[in-house]
Amino acid sequence: MTDSSWPTDERPRERLLAHGAQSLSDAELLAIFLRTGTTGMPVMALARHLIDEFSGLRGLMTASRRQFLQVKGLGTAKYAQVQAAMEMARRVMDEPLRQGDPLRSPADTRRFLTSRLGTYPHEVFAGLFLDNRHRVIQYRELFRGTIDGAAVYPREVVRQALEDNAAAVIFAHNHPSGVAEPSQADISLTRRLKEALGLVDIRVLDHMVIGHGEVISLAERGLM
């Protein structure tokens, strides 16, 4: 069932066109994306059900294929649509930090790292490797772990930085819990990495911790 049987001013698509996408709820945006419901469940009811089932849009958009297909009425076609939408959003966020471009602002860096790391259900430690003019050489996800943490090996980080001929690096990792507050272990690791890279004249500019809707800079906190 579609939304065509609703009063015109209550249909999500018409409300979007009249008032803008920002005026719609998460469920209404999802209903437009889904287009149709399932047998016995109109599209808005399905959208609300999915928001509840996955605890919000973030949970839905980052669900694994197995989790997604466990929900009645969702198939591989819808899963492919979700993945395509996620990748398009990620590429838009990536545009300010393409290879060879200089870092324009801390805000661009935050947005880029959030788009890359903010949706993982497990911890990922990454590096943004830069040349001596702070132009992007490469973004690399260096270590992956569990929901509780990822093991990081300074020797491997130094090797990768030298291989990329980097002059500076910005580190980042996500907290799957959603709380971006850096731990004492995060601070200690940053200082160890800074010391190890300093031996080969590579500067550590920052280490950012990515939560849900929040990014904390250890450099801004004076914790480097």
Swiss-Prot record:
Binding residues for Zn(2+): 173, 175, 186
Record's keyword annotation contains Metal-binding: yes
Gene3D superfamilies, alphabetized: Cytidine Deaminase, domain 2
A single GO BP: proteolysis
Keyword Nucleotidyltransferase among record annotations: no
Family: Belongs to the UPF0758 family.
Entry keyword set: Hydrolase, Metal-binding, Metalloprotease, Protease, Zinc
Transmembrane segments: none
Occurrences of domain MPN (ranges): 102-224
InterPro entries given in the database record: MPN, RadC_JAB, RuvA_2-like, UPF0758, UPF0758_CS, UPF0758_N
Protein name as it appears in the record: UPF0758 protein Maqu_3564
Domain of life: Bacteria
Motif JAMM motif boundaries: 173-186
Coiled coil stretches, renumbered: none
GO molecular function, one term: metal ion binding
